[in-house]
From Swiss-Prot:
Name of protein: Ribonuclease H
Recorded family membership: Belongs to the RNase H family.
Catalytic reactions of this protein: Endonucleolytic cleavage to 5'-phosphomonoester
GO MF annotation terms: magnesium ion binding; nucleic acid binding; RNA-DNA hybrid ribonuclease activity
HAMAP family tied to this protein: RNase_H
Record gene name: rnhA
Gene3D superfamilies with a match to the protein in the record: Ribonuclease H-like superfamily/Ribonuclease H
Oligomer status and interactors: Monomer.
E.C. numbers: 3.1.26.4
Domain RNase H type-1: residue ranges: 1-142
Length: 154
């Protein structure tokens, strides 16, 4: 029987592009874990993706995950758009390269390990875990020791 995990994620970018961060809150029974990281130059969409990737990557074994995000980009991308992108060799319907392909491929690999239910919540609407993720992401984006987002392409 797979462990049931609630994973909440959010990304933030100050400037877009600019300094950015991700935040994730994981809940398993009475256990709670928070994750955050910041990057010098990135975008909000990259940080939304990174939050989901890092949250899933933290799980040491396959789990049943209920992942809640305020990003329609992430939720629709991973549940709908990615199917066509993969069939077409990672190009869009208009034959343009998929943006953030490095992170979409990383998320796809993490998703394959788990059973995931993707949920959307309106951002900044008072949802406690989403608000906490937003706080973690903004704090990370404002940090002094920001990593380089090597996959970011202007």
């Amino acid at each position: 029987m797979l462990k049931k995990i609630d994973l909440y994620t959010d990304g933030s970018c100050l400037g877009n592009p600019g300094p950015g961060g991700y935040g994730a809150v994981m809940v398993y029974g009475k256990h709670r874990k928070e994750l955050a990281g910041g990057f010098r130059l990135t975008t909000n969409n990259r940080m939304e993706l990174m939050a989901a990737i890092m949250g899933l990557r933290t799980l040491n074994e396959p789990c049943q995950v209920r992942l809640t995000t305020d990003s329609q980009y992430v939720r629709q991308g991973i549940t709908q758009w990615i199917i066509g992108w993969k069939k077409k060799g990672w190009v869009t319907a208009s034959r343009q390269p998929v943006k953030n392909v490095d992170l979409w491929q990383a998320l796809d690999a993490e998703v394959a390990r788990h059973q995931i239910e993707w949920l959307w919540v309106k951002g900044h609407s008072g949802h406690p875990e989403n608000e906490r993720c937003d706080e973690l992401a903004r704090e990370a984006a404002s940090g002094k020791q920001l990593a380089e987002d090597t996959g970011y392409q202007p």
